[in-house]
Design a protein with these regions (language model features):
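Conserved short histidine dyad/triad with adjacent acidic residue
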Residues: 1-5, 24, 35-37
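Regulatory nucleotide-sensing modules
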Residues: 1-11, 15
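ATP/adenylate-binding site constellation spanning eukaryotic-like Ser/Thr protein kinases
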Residues: 15, 37, 60, 68, ...
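Cytochrome P450 core scaffold surrounding the K-helix E-X-X-R motif
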Residues: 20-27
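Cyclic-nucleotide recognition modules
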Residues: 33-98
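Polybasic "coupling" helices that flank or enter modular domains
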Residues: 59, 79-148
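Phosphate-/nucleic-acid-contacting segments
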Residues: 121-206
Length: 206
């Protein structure tokens, strides 16, 4: 989906990774968020006349298209699920605020470490980590576009994190040997992910 397109359905990522981005006419791109399995792209986007950003895939993805009728029925008959959708909207806004802080105030090393922590926590919340490891299909170009750094700077920063034994990158797998140390390096506080609101409080079956 590209900027200027007329939105119709809401996309739910069932598998794979995607991103939201803005792009200038000369091709320069700013990634403003990553979508992981279980994420909804632009809740209630169908109320807008046109897209003001683009959504691109990072890996092969499987999506479910959720219609306006679906959301109307959920809102009317399943208040717990409706609350969960509101929770996701608020968490997405909190993530966006944290990304703004990342771009404006953190150093290069802190930016990368913080982003890696966020992705690891989000994947763990979705049950997609394996001990200290998780899938990590992002390229250095993706990281550069998400953190406002050059690819050269990203490469150097990743080397620094590796040499400090904060991360291990093996192909498309990220290993975090000591999450607490990586959190400290990125000045990361997971409170903005509001993970305490996951679980039974939002269980539609209760």
């Amino acid at each position: 989906m590209r900027e200027g397109d007329k939105p119709k359905d809401v996309h739910l990522i069932l598998s794979g990774w995607a991103c939201r981005y803005k792009q200038l006419e000369d091709g320069r791109r700013q990634v403003v968020s990553f979508f992981l399995p279980g994420d909804i792209c632009d809740l209630n986007v169908f109320i807008l006349k046109e897209m003001d950003h683009s959504i691109g895939t990072i890996t092969s993805v499987t999506i479910a298209d959720l219609t306006r009728q679906f959301f109307d029925e959920i809102g009317a008959g399943y208040p717990r699920i409706a609350t969960a959708f509101w929770w996701e909207s608020l968490v997405n806004a909190a993530i966006q605020r944290e990304w703004t802080m990342n771009l404006g105030q953190r150093t290069a090393s802190e930016r990368i470490a913080h982003l890696l922590c966020e992705i690891f926590f989000r994947l763990r919340l979705a049950g997609l980590t394996h001990g200290e490891a998780c899938d990590f299909p992002l390229t250095q170009s993706d990281l550069a576009d998400a953190t406002g750094l050059s690819k050269v700077h990203v490469n150097r920063t990743l080397q620094e994190l590796r040499s400090s034994n904060l991360i291990v990158l093996k192909g498309k797998t990220l290993v975090v040997p000591d999450l607490e140390r990586l959190m400290s390096a990125g000045l990361f506080n997971a409170n903005y992910l509001h993970m305490d609101r996951e679980g039974r409080q939002l269980d539609a079956n209760e």
